[in-house]
């Protein structure tokens, strides 16, 4: 078993909101495995699945761009928010997003593509910007969606400039109907995705490993009731149905009209569109998601702790 350090306990507390002794016990029970410790705490009812770390995420901007029946969302990181508010950096991210639409490819494809304003590759243009602005930056993610018929709607939450912000969403809608009406429902669905962060479009598309992990947690929680195995199985099945409803886009309650599911809202929109609509794809990029940088600002750390 790996040594349980104070740093590990601190990280688990930040991720779950559980008490120090509970975190220490969870790590000891799971051999120091952080993800297993989170599940252990959840099974005991001590932590919630969606508690997020309070550590500082990478700065930068999310950019979206669209062209005809395709669109892209990119993430470009910087070291500080100050640079993210710099006009030159914003122009760079906006330009990279436009290049990404034309390449319709991965980060590597976008990085190798020519940046029109410089005549150099996007990668070399970023290097030039680093030298000029004096801060490290990188193209971290690029996701493109396209349809043969229909639209790919885009949405930036709390935009800091045209097509730029901290959270960007794409949603691809297949339809031969009216494009203006299709864009209207597409934007609403994109706003919904920004708010709820669904894991998949349909329940059956939820990652099997994620579903299995949830089932195991529910089993452990249900066993604490002391009920027979056949009752526990029914309890777990019921909780799994609710889980799929909560994390799959089409079965979620529509944030704009909670009386409808997203599927029902899209179906209702078909009247204005004049043709069937299929939700064919989605992408949601939150700035700095999954990336943490070293904390060196003691004052900021204290302020974050005070805010809870």
Curated annotation (Swiss-Prot):
Keywords: Cytoplasm, Elongation factor, Protein biosynthesis. Residues 80-83 are annotated as: Involved in Mg(2+) ion dislocation from EF-Tu. It is found in: Cytoplasm. One of its GO terms (cellular component) is cytoplasm. Its main location: cytoplasm. Belongs to the EF-Ts family. Associates with the EF-Tu.GDP complex and induces the exchange of GDP to GTP. It remains bound to the aminoacyl-tRNA.EF-Tu.GTP complex up to the GTP hydrolysis stage on the ribosome. This is Elongation factor Ts.
């Amino acid at each position: 078993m790996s040594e349980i350090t104070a740093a590990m306990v601190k990280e688990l507390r930040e991720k779950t909101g559980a008490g120090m002794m509970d975190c220490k016990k969870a790590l000891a029970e799971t051999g120091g495995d952080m993800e297993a410790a989170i599940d252990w705490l959840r099974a005991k009812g001590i932590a919630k699945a969606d508690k997020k770390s309070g550590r500082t995420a990478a700065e930068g901007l999310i950019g979206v761009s669209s062209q005809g029946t395709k669109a892209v969302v990119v993430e470009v990181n910087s070291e500080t928010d100050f640079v993210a508010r710099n006009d030159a950096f914003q122009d760079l991210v906006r330009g990279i997003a436009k290049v990404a639409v034309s390449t319709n490819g991965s980060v590597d494809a976008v990085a190798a593509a020519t940046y029109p304003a410089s005549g150099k590759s996007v990668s070399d243009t970023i290097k030039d910007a680093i030298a000029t602005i004096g801060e490290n930056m990188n193209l971290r993610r690029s996701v493109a969606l396209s349809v043969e018929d229909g639209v790919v709607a885009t949405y930036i939450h709390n935009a800091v400039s045209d097509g730029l912000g901290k959270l960007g969403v794409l949603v691809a809608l297949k339809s031969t109907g009216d494009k203006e009406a299709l864009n209207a429902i597409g934007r609403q669905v994109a706003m919904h995705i920004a708010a709820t962060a669904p894991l998949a479009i349909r329940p059956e598309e939820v990652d099997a490993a994620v579903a299995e992990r949830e089932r195991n947690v529910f089993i452990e929680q249900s066993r604490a009731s002391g009920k027979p195995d056949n009752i526990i199985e029914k309890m777990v099945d019921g909780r799994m149905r609710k889980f799929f409803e909560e994390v799959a886009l089409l079965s979620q309650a529509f944030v704009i009209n909670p009386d409808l599911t997203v599927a029902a809202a899209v179906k209702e929109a078909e009247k204005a569109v004049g043709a069937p609509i299929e939700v064919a794809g989605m992408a949601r990029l939150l700035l700095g998601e999954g990336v943490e940088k070293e904390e060196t600002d003691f004052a900021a750390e204290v302020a974050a702790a005070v805010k809870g």
